[in-house]
């Protein structure tokens, strides 16, 4: 019987490298695939893709597997980046990593791998898949500090049935130890952070290349004008840094936080103090719902949800407004709920799916 063929997405980082190594040790026929998803202003100053490809090739050589490089930049721009810009233009705060996983890493990549005769694809995500009576469940990674199921909630049954997450049961320290013990040259390489196509460049500088500035007033809830903002797209709910209005104006010496973005009036509302009531929301409305099993979770049940990556699970309930919109009510008010971000629902360690935060609700 021939070995099952797995195409591994190799980024040049330690996680995907160890994923490829483990699959090779488990007896799979492994092919490495380096994805280039961005070309605009692809300079060494801000983008590490050239070095990442070199690192991936070095690892593939040590493991003894072939490595192919493929360019998905056109697909990325059409399916991910255009949505990213549209959301910022509308005053929301999108999460492109979620869409990149669903549209590029587990769609364009999966299609390409099928053309290579792959039985499965694999990545270095900290997540797990469990087949329960023919239903594929997405589980949290064992390392709670690195769990990436939040970014994978849009994956469907067809995608999960072909997906392997070889390091999902490991802790990060163990991944680095395995890499070092097996002589992988990138065992100590720093983890990548931030949005992949922005790299190390300042976010405001990058966004201004694609969207024009639209300055407006910064106000308090009572209407006092505190200053001017450079454009609502540069701010997100809960933001403290970069407001340009100081930390002591207003009388009580507490720092200022963004509490609301009014796109119609082009007004940025700020409040003083991390625990200001206007920063807390007991409920939210979510749209563009995606459920991993293909079935909507039942109502009248206690679940847990995350409104941002690495947030602690927050107990909640779900009420469906229609088949593509729901209300999520929390047991405790949530801080800085940002429209455009993803809300992801869990039942214990199982990621059920989620949606995009459309609005916050006060009651």
From Swiss-Prot:
Tell me the active site: 100 (nucleophile), 196 (cysteine persulfide intermediate)
Q: Does the keyword Magnesium apply?
A: no
**Catalytic activity of the protein:** S-sulfanyl-L-cysteinyl-[protein] + uridine(34) in tRNA + AH2 + ATP = 2-thiouridine(34) in tRNA + L-cysteinyl-[protein] + A + AMP + diphosphate + H(+)
Compartment(s) where it occurs, according to its Swiss-Prot or TrEMBL record: Cytoplasm
User: What does the entry give for GO biological process?
Assistant: tRNA wobble position uridine thiolation
**What is the E.C. number?**
2.8.1.13
Region of interest called Interaction with tRNA, as start-end residue ranges on this chain: 146-148, 308-309
Give the intrachain disulfide bonds: 100-196
State the residue spans of region: Interaction with target base in tRNA: 95-97
Alphabetized PANTHER family for the sequence: MITOCHONDRIAL TRNA-SPECIFIC 2-THIOURIDYLASE 1 (PTHR11933:SF5), TRNA 5-METHYLAMINOMETHYL-2-THIOURIDYLATE -METHYLTRANSFERASE (PTHR11933)
UniProt protein name: tRNA-specific 2-thiouridylase MnmA
């Amino acid at each position: 019987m021939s070995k099952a063929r797995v195409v591994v997405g190799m980024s040049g980082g330690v996680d995907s490298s160890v994923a490829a190594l483990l699959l090779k040790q488990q007896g799979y026929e492994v092919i490495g695939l380096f994805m280039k998803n961005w070309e605009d202003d692809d300079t060494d100053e801000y983008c590490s893709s050239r070095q990442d490809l070199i690192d991936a090739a070095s690892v593939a050589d040590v493991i003894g597997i072939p490595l192919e490089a493929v360019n998905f930049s056109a697909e990325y721009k059409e399916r991910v980046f255009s949505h990213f810009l549209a959301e910022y233009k509308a005053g929301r705060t999108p999460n492109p990593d979620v869409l990149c996983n669903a549209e590029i890493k587990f769609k364009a990549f999966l299609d390409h791998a099928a053309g290579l005769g792959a039985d499965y694809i694999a990545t270095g995500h900290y997540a797990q898949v469990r087949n329960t009576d023919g239903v594929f469940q997405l589980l949290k990674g064992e390392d709670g500090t690195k769990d990436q199921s939040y970014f994978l909630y849009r994956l469907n049954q067809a995608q999960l049935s072909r997906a392997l997450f070889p390091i999902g049961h490991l802790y990060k320290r163990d991944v680095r130890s395995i890499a070092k013990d097996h002589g992988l040259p990138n065992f100590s390489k720093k983890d990548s952070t931030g949005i992949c196509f922005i790299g190390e460049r300042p976010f405001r500088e990058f966004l201004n290349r694609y969207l024009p500035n639209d300055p407006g007033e910064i106000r308090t809830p009572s209407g006092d004008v505190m200053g001017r903002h450079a454009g609502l797209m540069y701010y997100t709910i809960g933001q403290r840094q970069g407001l340009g209005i100081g930390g002591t104006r207003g009388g009580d010496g507490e720092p200022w936080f963004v509490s609301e973005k009014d796109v119609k009036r082009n007004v940025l509302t700020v409040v003083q103090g991390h625990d200001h009531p206007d920063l807390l929301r007991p409920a939210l409305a979510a749209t563009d719902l995606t459920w991993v099993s293909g079935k909507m979770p039942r109502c009248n049940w206690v679940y847990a949800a995350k409104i941002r990556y690495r947030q602690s699970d927050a107990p909640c309930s779900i009420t469906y407004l229609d088949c593509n919109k729901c209300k999520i009510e929390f047991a405790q008010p949530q801080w800085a709920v940002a429209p455009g971000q993803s809300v992801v629902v869990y039942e214990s360690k199982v990621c059920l799916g989620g949606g995009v935060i459309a609005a916050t609700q006060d009651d």
